[in-house]
Amino acid sequence: MTSSRLYLRFLRRFSTATGIDSQTTAYPGAITMSKAKSKLRKVQDPDKALAIYKSVSNNSTSPLSSRYAMELTVQRLAKSQRFSDIEALIESHKNNPKIKTETFLSTLIRSYGRASMFDHAMKMFEEMDKLGTPRTVVSFNALLAACLHSDLFERVPQLFDEFPQRYNNITPDKISYGMLIKSYCDSGKPEKAMEIMRDMEVKGVEVTIIAFTTILGSLYKNGLVDEAESLWIEMVNKGCDLDNTVYNVRLMNAAKESPERVKELMEEMSSVGLKPDTVSYNYLMTAYCVKGMMSEAKKVYEGLEQPNAATFRTLIFHLCINGLYDQGLTVFKKSAIVHKIPDFKTCKHLTEGLVKNNRMEDARGVARIVKKKFPPRLVTEWKKLEEKLGLYSKGNAAAVSSSSQTREVLDQEREDDV
């Protein structure tokens, strides 16, 4: 009865928000899964995300694709703090015959975790018997993932100890252990994670490259460099299948040393048949930025075929720190065109610098783009910043809307969306 009411609420909320009948296609035109994923990554408006999700959720037969679409949609809703809508959306799926399939229900558990609604995830896990869904390590791992996404790191060891004893069909596997390791690493206890790894070896449970990489990164982040290097040697001696991700963890630490050290490791990557990726070059760029070598950092950026959000955030931030606001503005405009604008703090640095240098029109242009891209909660905070900087008032509304650089960026965005 409860799930039926939530389902009806979801349909009413969805239809009202989008102006589209719930029985019709929610997004205009035929959308391939690839196109839908692209749009979900770009869109911040939660109602638009719901519309896209309804299209792909009805047509997709891939559990992985459906999970990806669901989690992205939930994240958009969570950013706007629309938790009742998240509950209505997820609970409405209980009416789907697939609910008796453990992988399907596990997606719902994980999605609650994406919204940091762990209590709801736990409740759904406990309802599996009533729903007629088998409970194995698959759903247990989904619950652990929800716990991690909710930043409840201390709960993971508790669940790991209690649930295999409570439920006969749950036997932790290498994925379960990997999440246990991550919980200790994320709570700043890499030494405890190492103990779990040794316990896995004794029990004959495979220590995956992901688990090794998680511990390695935590050791570096906690300043345990010697221990990290020892673990790296152990990984090499054991013949672990080293990949870009684990090398990038080493590059993360090398970026604190010097650009030369980063380049040495990148050459080592190439020598073992790995091609440095965007993340790798981001660390090289960061190393230059830390040393104040902004010309070299920009060369790295300009050589990237597909800079990611971290690329733009790092470069813009350091350009601003070095007083290069004009260059920062140019990079910001590029980030907006490719839907990868940096975080609130970085945009704040840029805008404050432009105002300080009497670039009010450019500052308003940045503000216009930020308000279009950020979720409602951050837009509210941004408007407070505008008022503080003297950017926002009834008298300058026309100036904001007439910003040529803003129109240029937004027009380019529309072309990219076609």
UniProtKB/Swiss-Prot annotation:
Q: Where is the transit peptide?
A: 1-14
Q: Which GO terms describe its cellular component?
A: mitochondrion
Q: What is its main location?
A: mitochondrion
- Annotated PPR repeats reside at 101-135, 136-166, 173-207, 208-242, 243-276, 277-311, 312-342, 343-373
Q: Where in the cell is it found?
A: Mitochondrion
Q: Which family does it belong to?
A: Belongs to the PPR family. P subfamily.
Alphabetical keyword list: Mitochondrion, Repeat, Transit peptide
InterPro entries from the entry?
A: Pentatricopeptide_rpt (IPR002885), TPR-like_helical_dom_sf (IPR011990)
User: What is this protein's record name?
Assistant: Pentatricopeptide repeat-containing protein At2g18520, mitochondrial
Any Pfam family matching the protein? PPR
